[in-house]
C-alpha cells in the first residue's frame, strides 16, 4: 500500500525541505505555537505566526505553505482566515487545516466548512475530529484527509498511505498533533503530491518519536528529545526504521 513511500522517497522530500527551507505560515492556537515553531525549525523549515487580519496576507505572501489551526480561534483569527484563503487561492499555495475540537462548537464547524471549499485542501486531525468532519469531507472531492493516531491514515487523490510509526508518549505532550500538521504543510511546500508530502512528514515525525522515546524518562524529556531526533534524522536511520 505504501510502495511509493519508501525510505529513499521520504529522504528525498526531507532533503528538499532542508535545501529550500520553506516558510510555513501558521495561524495556530496559543497552546501549540511554541512547539509548532520548534518542530518546524528542527525539520529545516521556518515558522511565521502572524495573526493580525490586516497583515496576515502580507506576511504569508512569500511563505511556501499555510497552516490554519482552529484550536483557540479568536475573533481576530476568524477575520484572518478569509485573507489566507484568498491568498492560497490566488497563488495556488498549499493550505493545511487542523480542525482542533471541531466537534465541540458550531463556530469551528462553520469555519471548517468555509476552509474546505479551497481546492486541493489538506486536512489533518485526530480520530474524533475527522469523524465529525466526515459528512463535510464526503462532499469535498480532491481533498487530502489525514487521520492521525497509533496508525496514521492518509487518503489522498493519489492513493492511500498508512504510517505505523510513532510512540504513545506523543499523546502526552500538548500540541504534537498541531506540530505534525505544520510538518505536513512544510512537505507540501516542496512536494506537489500531498499524499506523498504527508506520508514523508508523518513518517519522519513518527520515527523521531520512536527514537526520542528510547532516550527519554517521561513526557518532559520526550519533548526535548523529539526536537533533537527530528533535527538529526538521516536517510540511514529512515532505511533502518522503515525496514
Ligand atoms: N498511540 C500512538 N502510538 C504512536 N504514535 C501515536 C499514537 N497516538 C498518536 N501518535 C502520533 O502522535 C502524533 C500526533 O497525533 P494525535 O492524533 O495524537 O494528534 P492530536 O490528537 O491532534 O494532538 P494535539 O491536538 O494534542 O496536538 C502523530 O504523529 C501520531 O502518529
Ligand atoms: C490543549 C489545547 N486546547 C486548545 S488547542 C490545544 C492544543 C492541542 O490541540
Ligand atoms: Mg489536534
Report residues per predicted region.
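Charged C-terminal helix
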Residues: 5-8, 207-243
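Conserved N-terminal subdomain of the carbohydrate kinase-like
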Residues: 2-97
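Conserved phosphate-donor
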Residues: 122, 134-172
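Short, small-residue alpha-helix embedded
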Residues: 174-207
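Conserved beta-alpha-beta core of the PfkB/ribokinase-like small-molecule kinase fold
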Residues: 56, 65-137, 147
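Glycine/serine-rich anion-binding loops at beta->alpha junctions
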Residues: 28-33, 168-181
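Short, well-ordered alpha-helix to beta-strand connector turns
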Residues: 21, 63-64, 119-120, 142-143
